[in-house]
């Protein structure tokens, strides 16, 4: 049987959750489908993280729709999978292929009007989409997929000059208002927990450097290649997102059995209460950074299984193409 041909499109400029989702998904799909991907030429980090067996089409940041249309016409795909709204609006509706979009962010009806199907990752988005979106609608949780640990806790503490006995509170994301790193930083300064270190990791950290002058127990790092090393370093994971459509990092922290402090938002409210996670409002006076009785927590994360979730998306493709389940 001829392999289903898929063209993914992600024309972002950085590397965060949406880009990781794409790389993970095409890693899985390359075993079963004929997969290619369209990315911006200048996004070297994304390009370097894409499976080397997958064909990459690189485009420049001008006249993107014209370039993408040419690639699609030449590739003759069965499925075009758009990631983020700027990719979705560059694809015109066609009777020659099906267009599906993953709503990594909040979606706009005008941008997704050409899509045949939409994947969302939480119930709030699903309810919103039922009112506005006319195509096929699917809800699919994200997954966890992490690299093996390559540097142990002792090595990293020494490298980062963290005192051996200090409790490490950590968060991984982006230094963007959405992620709430400013809230974590403010709260940590206010409470000033003894014998502890705050470690915040993500793109855009340079703008925060002036906020941690004279704070030897606060460390900011930029993008890192292996998050597993740092989850393994954390004693407690802290997430203060103002909003998310899901939240990769919270589920990743669960894989490391970390005690977790998190805000509540539309991306996690479907499932967060099923787990032993401390839900907090970072703007209130309640104490958050406790340093005593910190123990590992066992979570059942089977609902976020990588292979199961990717297989689910494969079935979505097949349903759009009218291919019956085996």
Where are these regions (language model features)?
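Short, structured helix-loop element that forms part of the nucleotide-activated donor/catalytic region
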Residues: 43-50, 197-221
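Donor nucleotide-sugar binding/catalytic pocket of nucleotide-sugar-dependent glycosyltransferases
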Residues: 116-151
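Short hydrophobic beta-strand element within catalytic cores of glycosyltransferases
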Residues: 39, 259-262
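N-terminal strand-loop element at the rim of the active site
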Residues: 8-64, 204
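A conserved mid-protein helix/loop that constitutes part of the nucleotide-sugar donor-binding site
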Residues: 16-24, 167, 171-190
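Aromatic "clamp/platform" in nucleotide-sugar-dependent glycosyltransferases that forms part
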Residues: 223, 242
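Short His-centered aromatic/hydrophobic patch
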Residues: 61-64, 82-88, 103
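A charged, aromatic-enriched C-terminal amphipathic alpha-helix characteristic of glycosyltransferases
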Residues: 17, 293-326
């Amino acid at each position: 049987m001829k392999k289903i041909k898929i063209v993914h499109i992600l024309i972002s400029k950085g590397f965060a959750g949406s880009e990781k989702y794409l790389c993970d998904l095409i890693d899985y799909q390359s075993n079963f489908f004929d997969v290619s991907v369209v990315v911006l030429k200048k996004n070297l980090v994304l390009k370097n993280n894409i499976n080397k067996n997958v064909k990459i089409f690189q485009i420049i940041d001008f006249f993107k729709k014209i370039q993408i249309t040419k690639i699609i016409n030449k590739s003759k795909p069965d499925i075009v999978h758009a990631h983020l709204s700027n990719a979705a609006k560059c694809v015109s509706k066609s009777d020659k292929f099906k267009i599906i979009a993953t709503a990594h962010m909040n979606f706009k009806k005008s941008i997704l009007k050409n899509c045949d199907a939409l994947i969302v990752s939480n119930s709030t988005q699903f309810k919103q989409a039922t009112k506005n979106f006319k195509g096929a609608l699917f809800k699919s949780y994200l997954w966890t997929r992490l690299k093996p640990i390559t540097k142990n806790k002792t090595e990293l503490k020494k490298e980062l000059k963290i005192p051996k006995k200090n409790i490490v509170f950590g968060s991984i994301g982006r230094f963007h208002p959405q992620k709430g790193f400013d809230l974590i930083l403010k709260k940590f300064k206010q409470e000033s927990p003894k014998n502890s270190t705050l470690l915040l990791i993500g793109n855009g950290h340079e703008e925060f450097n002036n906020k941690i002058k004279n704070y030897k127990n606060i460390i900011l790092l930029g993008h890192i290649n292996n998050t597993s090393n740092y989850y393994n370093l954390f004693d407690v994971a802290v997430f203060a997102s103002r909003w998310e459509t899901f939240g990769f990092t919270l589920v990743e922290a669960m894989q490391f059995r970390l005690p977790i402090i998190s805000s509540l938002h539309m991306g996690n409210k479907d499932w967060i209460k099923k787990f032993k996670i401390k839900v907090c409002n970072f703007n209130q006076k309640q104490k958050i950074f406790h340093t005593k009785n910190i123990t590992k927590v066992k979570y059942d994360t089977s609902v976020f299984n990588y292979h199961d979730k990717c297989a689910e998306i494969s079935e979505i493709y097949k349903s759009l193409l009218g291919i019956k389940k085996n």
